């Protein structure tokens, strides 16, 4: 695997920016008909990708490789910066600077794509049109939606105004992830540190406890672990949704003296008095803290939730869990955090989803069956110390699906090496360029023809 990774980085071509390209994917309403006719005559397919994060850029790059000059790829994304968010755990542990997680979005827009620096406000799938905040009307032949999750900071009273001060921090924010390590270093004998998990699904189900274990290890290395109370307050019912890993983490918590408080949902932060209020089955419970790491509630963006694309039950884009095609609109696809796929929302999941989505979109274009199926594969490297990781890999039904030749529920040095030195490079130089396929490394498991 490692040799394959190094080879990939050596041969990967440079990405050329298209940030100065005119937005030829944007037309007025009166031009829509003529533009469609021109594309039809030239056999050009227009694909609009809403969202320029991990999912959107992965799909855009893979589509560019397949469509060559027969694809008009438009990426609608307002942000000028792109973040490798899995690194924020290690930033919170003092291993990296937050600047190591940040690059310019323009450097990852495929050279054949058009970047519309805007955000979509309305989806009109019946008309094959999206409307943007700046008043643009963009038509498409195919639509890919990958807008990610919205973090609901305001759903915990007092959280927004206290974030980054009064001992309140979160590795889910670029603005506060460096504060996490500052607060860990400030812990003293007699202090209490709390780590929370909300009622909603989150980005990477194991991330809320990664910083707990780094804090535990840091305090041990500095000889005060037995004098600082660590509480894991989760709105859930277990340490992890996959039984095999949850049992190991539960045992670890008991051995390391971590207090586990399940069915504890954070509802309020009182920064001035350093108190946290939790909703429990027995009523609200107020706890004093010196440091609290908060994972905010998360969910679909309102533009998705209120659109015809949404699953009424979840608010996420309603797709077939195998093909990633929308259940109603056959020219609409979705992947990653914004989809209603019943699996953990991680970058690793996207590495498996993207080639399947691209393969099925091409099959649909060619009038072929959508025979590529996503099995729910996802992965979560759970940092258990500064040197070791439990590498959780599983698929639909929380079925274990490990890829390394050892029991991955055991703490290991090798996955930490991957997380620190391989995965970031694979993300920037492979995944976003459409040349990294997760557990399949360089080898795209989906074989589809190029469109000429």
UniProtKB/Swiss-Prot annotation:
Record-listed FAD binding positions: 54-55, 77, 85, 120, 337, 345-348
Pfam families for this protein: Pyr_redox_2
A Gene Ontology term for the protein's cellular component: mitochondrion
Stored SUPFAM superfamilies: FAD/NAD(P)-binding domain
Disulfide cysteine pairs (residue numbers): 204-380
Textual note on the cofactor: Binds 1 FAD per subunit.
Active site: 204 (cysteine persulfide intermediate), 380 (cysteine persulfide intermediate)
Localization annotation: Mitochondrion
GO BP term (any one): sulfide oxidation, using sulfide:quinone oxidoreductase
Molecular-function GO terms, alphabetical: FAD binding; glutathione-dependent sulfide quinone oxidoreductase activity; quinone binding; sulfide:quinone oxidoreductase activity
Cofactor (UniProt): FAD
InterPro entries linked: FAD/NAD-bd_sf, FAD/NAD-binding_dom, Sulphide_quinone_reductase
Alphabetical UniProt keywords: Disulfide bond, FAD, Flavoprotein, Mitochondrion, Oxidoreductase, Quinone, Transit peptide
Enzyme Commission number, as recorded: 1.8.5.8
Catalytic activity: ubiquinone-10 + hydrogen sulfide + sulfite + 2 H(+) = ubiquinol-10 + thiosulfate; a quinone + hydrogen sulfide + glutathione + H(+) = S-sulfanylglutathione + a quinol
Entry similarity comment: Belongs to the SQRD family.
Function description: Catalyzes the oxidation of hydrogen sulfide, with the help of a quinone.
PANTHER family to which the protein is assigned, alphabetical: SULFIDE:QUINONE OXIDOREDUCTASE (PTHR10632), SULFIDE:QUINONE OXIDOREDUCTASE, MITOCHONDRIAL (PTHR10632:SF2)
Name of the protein this chain belongs to: Sulfide:quinone oxidoreductase, mitochondrial
Taxon lineage: Eukaryota, Amoebozoa, Evosea, Eumycetozoa, Dictyostelia
Gene name per UniProt: sqor
């Amino acid at each position: 695997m490692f040799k394959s990774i190094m080879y990939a980085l050596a041969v990967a071509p440079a990405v050329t920016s298209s940030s100065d390209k005119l937005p030829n994917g944007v037309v007025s309403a009166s031009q829509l008909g003529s533009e469609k006719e021109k594309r039809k005559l030239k056999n050009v397919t227009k694909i609009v990708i809403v969202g320029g994060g991990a999912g959107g850029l992965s799909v855009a790059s893979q589509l560019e490789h397949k469509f060559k000059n027969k694809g008009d790829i438009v990426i609608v994304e307002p942000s000028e910066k792109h973040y490798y968010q899995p690194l924020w755990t290690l930033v919170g542990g003092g291993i990296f600077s937050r600047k190591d997680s940040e690059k310019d979005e323009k450097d990852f827009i495929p050279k054949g794509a058009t970047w519309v620096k805007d955000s979509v406000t309305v989806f009109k799938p019946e008309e094959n049109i999206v409307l943007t905040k700046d008043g643009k009307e963009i038509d498409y032949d195919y639509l890919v939606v990958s807008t990610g999750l919205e973090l609901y900071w305001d759903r915990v009273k007092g959280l927004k105004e206290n974030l980054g001060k009064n001992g309140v921090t979160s590795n889910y924010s670029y603005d506060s992830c460096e504060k996490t390590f500052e607060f860990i270093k400030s812990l003293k004998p007699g202090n209490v540190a709390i780590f929370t998990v909300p009622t909603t699904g989150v980005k990477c189900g194991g991330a809320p406890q990664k910083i707990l274990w780094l804090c535990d290890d840091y305090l041990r290395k500095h000889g005060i672990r037995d004098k600082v109370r660590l509480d894991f307050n989760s709105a859930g019912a277990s340490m992890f949704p996959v039984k095999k890993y949850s049992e190991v983490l539960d045992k670890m918590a008991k051995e390391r003296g971590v207090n586990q408080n399940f069915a504890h949902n954070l509802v309020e932060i009182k920064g001035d008095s350093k108190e946290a209020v939790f909703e429990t089955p027995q009523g609200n419970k107020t706890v004093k803290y010196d440091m609290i790491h908060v994972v905010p509630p998360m969910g679909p963006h309102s533009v998705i939730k209120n659109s015809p694309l949404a699953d009424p039950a979840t608010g996420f884009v309603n797709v077939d869990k195998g093909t990633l095609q929308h259940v109603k609109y056959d020219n609409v696809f979705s992947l990653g955090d914004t989809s209603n796929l019943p699996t953990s929302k991680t970058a690793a999941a996207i590495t498996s989803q993207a080639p399947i989505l691209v393969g099925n979109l091409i099959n649909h274009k060619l009038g072929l069956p959508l025979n590529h199926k996503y099995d729910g594969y996802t992965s979560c490297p759970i940092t258990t110390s500064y040197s070791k990781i439990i590498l959780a890999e599983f698929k639909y039904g929380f079925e274990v699906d490990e890829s390394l030749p050892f029991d991955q529920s055991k703490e290991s040095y090798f996955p930490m090496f991957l997380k620190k030195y391989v995965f970031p490079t694979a993300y920037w130089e492979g995944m976003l360029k459409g040349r990294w396929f997760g557990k399949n490394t360089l080898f795209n498991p989906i074989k589809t023809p190029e469109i000429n």
